[in-house]
C-alpha cells in the first residue's frame, strides 16, 4: 500500500540522518547551549522558506529569540545563526553564512549535499 511505502521511505531517511548527522546534531546543540550559557543569542536566518523557521513558536519547544533581519539585527561573536538552503547553493544564504563565520558567529546550516550534487 502507498502508506506503507511512504512510512518505509520516511524511516529510511530518518535512519540516514541518525547515522550520518548524529555528531553534527550534538555539535549544534552544544553551540546553542554554550551561546545561551554565555549570554549569546540564537537567530534563525529566514532568507528563503527555510526549515529553520520551524524552530520559532513550536508547541512544546523553545521559543527562540527572533529571526535574523539584516537591517535590524547585529550578531556578535558567540551568537548562533541557523540558515538553510536545500541545495547549499543559495547565494544569499552562502554569503550570509560566510560573513557571519568571519565575524565569529557560529553558523548551523540545514542543507542536503546529496540534493546539491
Residue ranges and their predicted role:
Residues 1-19:
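Generic N-terminal amphipathic, Lys/Arg-enriched alpha-helix
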Residues 2, 24-27, 47:
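Short, contiguous, pocket-lining structural segments
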Residues 3, 21-23, 60, 107:
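A short linear-motif detector with a strong N-terminal bias
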Residues 11, 29, 33, 53-56:
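Predominant activation on well-ordered alpha-helical scaffold segments within soluble catalytic domains
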Residues 14-24, 81-90:
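Short, glycine-rich nucleotide/cofactor-binding loops
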Residues 15, 30-34, 98:
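Surface-exposed alpha-helical segments enriched in charged/polar residues
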Residues 20-37:
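A short, well-structured juxtamembrane/interface segment
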Residues 37, 41, 46-117:
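Glycine-rich phosphate-binding loops that contact phosphosugars or nucleotide phosphates
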Amino acid at each position: 500500500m502507498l502508506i506503507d511505502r511512504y512510512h518505509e521511505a520516511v524511516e529510511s531517511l530518518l535512519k540516514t540522518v541518525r547515522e550520518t548527522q548524529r555528531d553534527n546534531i550534538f555539535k549544534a546543540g552544544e553551540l546553542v547551549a554554550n551561546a545561551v550559557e554565555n549570554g549569546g543569542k540564537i537567530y534563525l536566518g529566514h532568507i528563503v522558506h527555510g526549515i529553520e523557521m520551524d524552530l520559532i513558536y513550536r508547541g512544546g519547544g523553545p521559543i527562540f529569540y527572533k529571526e535574523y533581519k539584516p537591517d535590524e539585527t547585529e550578531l556578535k561573536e558567540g551568537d548562533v545563526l541557523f540558515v538553510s538552503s536545500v541545495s547549499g547553493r543559495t547565494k544569499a544564504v552562502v554569503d550570509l553564512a560566510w560573513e557571519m563565520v568571519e565575524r565569529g558567529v557560529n553558523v548551523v546550516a540545514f542543507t542536503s549535499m546529496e540534493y546539491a550534487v
